[in-house]
């Protein structure tokens, strides 16, 4: 492996001069810099990131933490988040991904290990993790969950508005008996989506039936089980809003298992717009949440914060988009 000392020997300069030239120092004459850069290219020189990190007191690592990777995080949500962050971080950074619930303690989360952290937060149980990061003065951006600390850059989607729009679509299609399969209890996304559901019913003077609210776990199995409970009611709903697409797919399978059809017998709307949602039969109407866009923006904001620590914190709310497909039946003509 070619080192700085090898280049220095061939260029007949000190290794300090080579190091400065490779880092585009203004203190190195242009002709010397050009000679060194040409030699580095000819020799296929690759910087030793670990050595550079020690010298600059930087880890060149970005931490991407989820509340949990195994509980309540769908494959598509996980993939879109990583894809978005990877689009934004430069080749100078490594990405380390972990679930907070996998950590025994926070001792390993230090400025020496992470230049900055992106937290894809799903619950206020993350607050102790946020406090730790702040205490260690590690640059931080929080995604997905609305937080009260206005000194932290916070980026999320308007889930309440998105779910309200979905339920209003049911109402405009003539549905009155509308149920909800909720997400994981304690998750902010679950709360926001239920609030949107309730707001739509209240604004349109539709009675709220508590038996139409069934809890799920953001997975297909819980969606299936929740739908079975709704179908067992004396007066089953004609429409069901599911707090994510995985549960919507599970709910549709429960409907099919009873010999019923979507949307002829029961209409279904999901949330997230996972890639699979437009390839099932019928194609699932759903609320598209801009997870990848939020992740790209979060990584960009973190890089700005790393380079300019005095960057002002901001709260950014991204809009959702309702995707009309084939899973809702119109009862009114």
Curated annotation (Swiss-Prot):
Reported induction: Induced by galacturonate, repressed by glucose.
Outcome of gene disruption: Cells lacking this gene express the exu locus genes (required for hexuronate utilization) constitutively. Its absence additionally confers the ability to grow on minimal medium plus glucuronate, which cells cannot do in the presence of ExuR.
- Pfam families from the UniProt entry: LacI, Peripla_BP_3
Q: Name one GO biological process term.
A: regulation of DNA-templated transcription
Q: Which part of the chain is the HTH lacI-type domain? A: 2-56
Q: Does the keyword Zinc-finger apply?
A: no
**Any idea which residues the entry calls the DNA-binding region?**
4-23
**Which InterPro entries does this entry report, sorted A to Z?**
HTH_LacI, LacI/GalR-like_sensor, Lambda_DNA-bd_dom_sf, Peripla_BP_I
Keyword terms: DNA-binding, Repressor, Transcription, Transcription regulation
Q: Name one GO molecular function term.
A: transcription cis-regulatory region binding
What domain of life does the UniProt record list for this protein's source? Bacteria
| Protein purpose | Transcriptional repressor for the exu locus which is required for galacturonate utilization.
Q: Which PANTHER family does this UniProt record tie to the protein?
A: HTH-TYPE TRANSCRIPTIONAL REPRESSOR PURR-RELATED, LACI-RELATED TRANSCRIPTIONAL REPRESSOR
| Protein name in the entry | Probable HTH-type transcriptional repressor ExuR
């Amino acid at each position: 492996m070619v080192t700085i000392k090898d280049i220095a020997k061939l260029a007949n300069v000190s290794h300090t001069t080579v190091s400065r030239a490779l880092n585009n120092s203004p203190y190195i004459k242009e002709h010397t810099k050009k000679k060194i850069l040409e030699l580095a290219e000819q020799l296929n020189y690759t910087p030793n990131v670990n050595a550079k990190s020690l010298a600059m007191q930087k880890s060149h690592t970005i931490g991407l933490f989820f509340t949990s990777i195994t509980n309540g995080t769908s494959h598509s949500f996980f993939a879109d988040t990583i894809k978005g962050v990877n689009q934004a971080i430069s080749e100078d950074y490594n990405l380390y991904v972990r679930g907070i619930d996998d950590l025994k303690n926070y001792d390993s989360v230090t400025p020496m290990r992470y230049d900055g952290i992106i937290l894809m937060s799903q619950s206020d149980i993350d607050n102790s993790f946020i406090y730790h990061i702040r205490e260690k003065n590690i640059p931080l951006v929080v995604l997905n969950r609305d937080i009260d600390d206005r000194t932290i850059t916070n980026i999320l989607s308007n889930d309440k508005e998105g779910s309200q729009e979905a339920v209003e679509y049911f109402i405009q299609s003539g549905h009155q008996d509308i149920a909800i399969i909720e997400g994981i209890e304690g998750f902010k996304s679950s709360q926001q989506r239920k609030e949107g559901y309730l707001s739509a019913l209240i604004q349109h003077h539709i009675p709220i039936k508590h038996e139409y609210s069934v809890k799920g776990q953001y997975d297909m199995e819980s969606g299936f089980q929740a739908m079975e409970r709704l179908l067992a009611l004396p007066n089953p709903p004609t429409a069901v809003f599911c707090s994510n697409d995985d549960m919507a797919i599970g709910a549709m399978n429960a409907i099919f298992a009873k010999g019923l059809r979507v949307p002829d017998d029961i209409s279904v709307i999901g949330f997230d717009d996972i890639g699979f949602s437009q390839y099932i039969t019928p194609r699932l109407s759903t609320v598209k949440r801009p997870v990848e866009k939020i992740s790209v923006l979060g990584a960009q904001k973190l890089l700005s914060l790393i380079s300019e620590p005095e960057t002002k914190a901001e709260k950014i709310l991204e809009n959702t988009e309702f995707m009309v497909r084939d899973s809702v039946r119109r009862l009114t003509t």
